[in-house]
């Protein structure tokens, strides 16, 4: 089934479209469309809305129709027909000018009103709409029909009220401008028909004037004024009550007084300064002492080595020597992970190391420290070599 065929199944759209195409004259509507209408009540209060399964419209009940209904069905209220089926036996269409800002079942300040003269409920029948009905006056195609109707009415008004003699002479106006004469701004504007401000109102259709009852008046007849007042009060309360929102960002707290604000700021500053002092103390505690000069020898360790740790070298007595607390003197540190020493620095290191052990160093930087027993010295070795050469 195509989209156009589905739209043609809407009885309300077909009926109201033909009504506008015929100039808003219900007497010209085809008799085939004036049959009883079986509709489903979408809403019964505060608006009475009926639907054909595709679009909904607002019926308007005459006083005689309401009286007949109450006489034939005394145990059924009109305002309680929600979700029920009604059959509209006698009805008519009227075209009225309204304010579309106030009447939602209208468009471009025009309303095609469904006037109900006789109807009955069909309580045994239940309908299950397959789609959610929408407002007929919000359908794009139907709004185009109404716009076309207004355009035709505007053309008819211009053709009827505009005569050749009443049209302004444009040549005179242009000549006056060329001569430097002053002319009125609205001299070339043609006004036709009656209008209210910028709104066109010169329609040729006969506006309907059938008296109908408001749904609020029908509610009072069936349930009384007190019930109506209670419902209206509930509606007002539901509008005034602000919904509680849960989750999301928390709301802003109320602004505190100036004194409380000052106390809070002072407490924050004190806490921040205390944190800074703690951080500085930790840095000072775990930072090793740096020698003031590169030539200075590191100070002796004043603290005992940690438990389980000792130097790998032992003295002649068997006791372990302590590792200096500070590193040995060296040059500037390189960008690598270890220090690189020059030859001069290495010689200084040897001098320092021998002094630490109690040995002696030569002026050339050679070590002249203690030697173990049983080993010949360098001078004795040289003398023995010289004696061997002389013997030969």
Curated annotation (Swiss-Prot):
Q: SUPFAM superfamilies annotated for this entry?
A: Nucleic acid-binding proteins
> Which Gene Ontology molecular function entries are recorded, alphabetically?
telomeric DNA binding
Basic residues bias: start-end ranges: 247-256
Q: What is its main location?
A: nucleus
Compositional bias annotation for Polar residues: 328-343
UniProt keyword list:
Chromosome, DNA-binding, Nucleus, Telomere
Where is the sequence biased in composition, kind Low complexity? Answer: 257-268, 374-384
Record-linked InterPro entries: NA-bd_OB-fold (IPR012340), TEBB (IPR010874), TEBP_beta_dom_sf (IPR023113)
The question of whether Nucleus is a record keyword is answered with yes
The entry's localization annotation reads: Nucleus; Chromosome, Telomere
Top-rank taxon: Eukaryota
The keyword Nucleus belongs to this UniProt entry's keyword annotation: yes
Q: Which Gene3D superfamilies match?
A: Telomere-binding Protein Beta Subunit, Chain
Region of interest (Disordered), ranges? 234-392
Q: Which residues lie in Basic and acidic residues bias regions? A: 269-284
Where does the record place a coiled coil?
none
- According to its record, what are the GO cellular component terms? chromosome, telomeric region; nucleus
Subunit text:
Heterodimer of an alpha and a beta subunit.
Summarizing the function annotation, the protein's role is: May function as protective capping of the single-stranded telomeric overhang. May also participate in telomere length regulation during DNA replication.
What is this protein's name?
Telomere-binding protein subunit beta
Organism annotation:
Stylonychia mytilus (Ciliate)
